């Protein structure tokens, strides 16, 4: 994902690249990030330890990197509601408020969508992901092409083409329903 940001998006700001490398760490391994190997992650309450994980990132890589990681970290969604709708609302808010975070979220989104055909989960799970991502493709395109998105024009062209492929992949898996 970080290599796509550098090679294809044309973005080389160090704090953005660092945040791209760390983008899932607060969601996936907050306990290990905050406390090392002392406690297995499955025994740690992720929400409780996210602030400590973000502080570790700030201490090691700087506040600007930690802020970007915090921005792209998905919140805990209300499981009693529609988590896909909550995810889409979160992404739109994030993309609207944080132009630098768009760079990371766009790369992650493209990676997730284009990678559907490499996903080893059961077909039903892949279809759920396709239905989660597909409604956001045009929104992602709008934010990618926005003037305040800190990506050079050639990077925006790459994103535009990649979102076309992402849409095709999502449509394919949705059509298998």
Residue ranges, per PLM feature:
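Active-site helical microenvironments for divalent-metal-assisted chemistry
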Residues: 1-177
């Amino acid at each position: 994902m970080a290599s796509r940001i550098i090679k294809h998006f044309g973005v080389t700001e160090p704090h953005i690249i660092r945040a791209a490398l760390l983008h899932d760490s607060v969601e996936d391994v907050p306990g290990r990030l905050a406390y090392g190997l002392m406690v297995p992650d499955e025994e740690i309450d992720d929400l409780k330890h996210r602030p400590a994980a973000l502080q570790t990132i700030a201490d090691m890589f700087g506040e600007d990197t930690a802020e970007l990681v915090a921005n792209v970290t998905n919140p805990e969604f209300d499981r009693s509601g529609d988590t896909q709708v909550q995810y889409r609302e979160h992404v739109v808010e994030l993309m609207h408020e944080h132009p630098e975070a768009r760079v990371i979220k766009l790369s992650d989104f493209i990676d997730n969508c284009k990678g559907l055909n490499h996903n080893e989960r059961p077909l039903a799970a892949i279809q759920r992901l396709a239905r989660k991502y597909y409604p956001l493709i045009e929104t992602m395109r709008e934010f990618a092409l926005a003037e305040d998105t800190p990506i050079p024009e050639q990077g925006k062209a790459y994103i535009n083409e990649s979102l076309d492929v992402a849409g095709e992949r999502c449509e394919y898996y949705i059509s298998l329903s």
